[in-house]
Amino acid sequence: MKNLFSLLKLTVFTLILFAVIYPLAIYGIAKLAPNQGKGETISVNGKVVGYQKIGQKFDKSNYFWGRPSAVDYNAAGSAGSNKGPSNADYLALVQKRIDTLLLVHPYLKKSDIPVDMVTASGSGLDPNISPQGALIQVKRIAKERMLDEAKVKSLVESKINTAVVGPETVNVLELNVALDQLK
């Protein structure tokens, strides 16, 4: 009976700790974060067009394309594909993405394509690409929008985020919003 009472106390304690105290602590911490933990929105003319930390699908030729998504940019189903580099289906999918990039960007060589442009991230919702991933698309964007290539390249360079730790990145949504404002 003593053991049963001890186990019951432990169960109630862990239930209160993990079902009440921990969620309230996380909620309190989130309230201290920018935008009270609701996510950092990107707005155009007062209308929210997306979130800074969640990738979106851009497939029109006059926009910069982001990283491929294993979940077709479905935030509710955030996940990677779980297919490794030895999986034949995965290799075929990566090759298809390479072929598509080479077809749309005939001036590129296979070796010019950065890995992040043909592989999905672990979350499937990565909002960023490498600066090289953006720069290889400059010629296509400039042609589609009838803009000076140097102007588009300068825009990309102005949107490169340098992290204290980790690689430089470019947020695709922020870049495309700025691109729409470019004249």
UniProtKB/Swiss-Prot annotation:
GO function terms (MF aspect): ATP binding; P-type potassium transmembrane transporter activity
Bilayer topology annotation: Single-pass membrane protein
Keywords from the UniProt entry: ATP-binding, Cell inner membrane, Cell membrane, Ion transport, Membrane, Nucleotide-binding, Potassium, Potassium transport, Transmembrane, Transmembrane helix, Transport
Compartments it resides in: Cell inner membrane
GO cellular component: plasma membrane
Transmembrane segments: 10-30
Family: Belongs to the KdpC family.
HAMAP family for the chain: KdpC
PANTHER family: POTASSIUM-TRANSPORTING ATPASE C CHAIN, POTASSIUM-TRANSPORTING ATPASE KDPC SUBUNIT
Cited function: Part of the high-affinity ATP-driven potassium transport (or Kdp) system, which catalyzes the hydrolysis of ATP coupled with the electrogenic transport of potassium into the cytoplasm. This subunit acts as a catalytic chaperone that increases the ATP-binding affinity of the ATP-hydrolyzing subunit KdpB by the formation of a transient KdpB/KdpC/ATP ternary complex.
Complex and partners: The system is composed of three essential subunits: KdpA, KdpB and KdpC.
Protein name: Potassium-transporting ATPase KdpC subunit
Species: Flavobacterium johnsoniae (strain ATCC 17061 / DSM 2064 / JCM 8514 / BCRC 14874 / CCUG 350202 / NBRC 14942 / NCIMB 11054 / UW101)
